[in-house]
């Protein structure tokens, strides 16, 4: 019991108990603005006809917000006013201020709660002295790891991490790390009133989706911390899985201790459940070869063990979310596939293991014999179907992949239209540079290239053929990256691998820290 208690407390010792007073500091909201938390239309610089003030008056609005936070029933009154204004249609300015204040509070709160975790990250990097830390942040850094490790693995689990169904779950997780009780009460009250405000207009199961759309940074922080807590518990279970005793299969099916419901606080509840779970008679497998990778809400769990072991971890995840986070998770959201027969979609790539058979004739003195060899290669391909679906959602083509024009961009200049289409192509080429086959990427480029031509032809009220003849090859040059032109002079166009045909060289860049927006659409 003391060992488990120490494990959960050793990383939670650096708690910051005095964060609530920062809500009343003007520089917090100025910092939120300076860091560009609202790049898609900042709430600090709204149009004059909506705001009634110029952009220099945002500081006065921040001061007014701080004064209203001191008031006892500000949130309740603002919610009632906003609901009345929504239905009646009067006092539009007051309703806008209530919505404006809620967004400002969410952004300021996101800045405050990020402070202790940022300090902890900086101190951790100084202690560990990790070289080239920025390279490890790259999304592409995970694929060389896959190339080395997944070649010898048997199964992979495709996991979709669920969203909590209630905001209180996020607050309870956060209170394990932050001891500032007034700040947690303020967050709980803000989330409660915010969801009640939107419950008049949306259903209950969409309240979190509405909250995530309007307060992106705060929800992103809460969700990322929730995922971190999931992984924190997963690492604990993984480290202690080898301590389980080997017994008969019948006791494995019972699992009576794990299903016992415990009424305790968040951390104590998990420790007690884990104690009963690990001290009970449970048949388990020791698998030292297990690897885990995650990006956003999707995770990959690969193992060298058997299918039964993967099912064990599958139900461990289900029970974890059910008894620790107190919400139901459907087991069908975790897919277990055999790596030799299935591919998995992760980080915008379709990854799989390719087996290549070859026969080598060996001659020794007067005897000759044939040797059959098998080589396995980690292959990454461009998910053409997913990208075409993303392009159709963005209105660049139809569902079947037929290019169409982009009417909303016809008001731009010709150079602006070409620059936008070219930037999309360059980003896709840069991100999918690790694909072993480029045919799918060429198809996506062709769709964007023809969509650009159709958009320009629509702007000038001409046909695509006439416009391309007048433009010449200048349009095509905009869709090549500078790196592709440089690499074509350095690397050969085709590289022959052993026991394979001619394939393109895969290149992984260590400066990509986010997924392309088109991949998120898919």
UniProtKB/Swiss-Prot annotation:
Homology family: Belongs to the intron maturase 2 family. MatK subfamily.
Regions crossing the membrane: none
Major location category of this protein: plastid
Recorded superkingdom: Eukaryota
InterPro entries in the record: Domain_X (IPR024937), Maturase_MatK (IPR002866), Maturase_MatK_N (IPR024942)
Name of the featured protein: Maturase K
Keywords: Chloroplast, mRNA processing, Plastid, RNA-binding, tRNA processing
GO MF, any single term: RNA binding
Chain's role: Usually encoded in the trnK tRNA gene intron. Probably assists in splicing its own and other chloroplast group II introns.
Gene: matK
Annotated Gene Ontology cellular component terms: chloroplast
Localization per Swiss-Prot or TrEMBL: Plastid, Chloroplast
GO biological process terms, semicolon-separated: mRNA processing; RNA splicing; tRNA processing
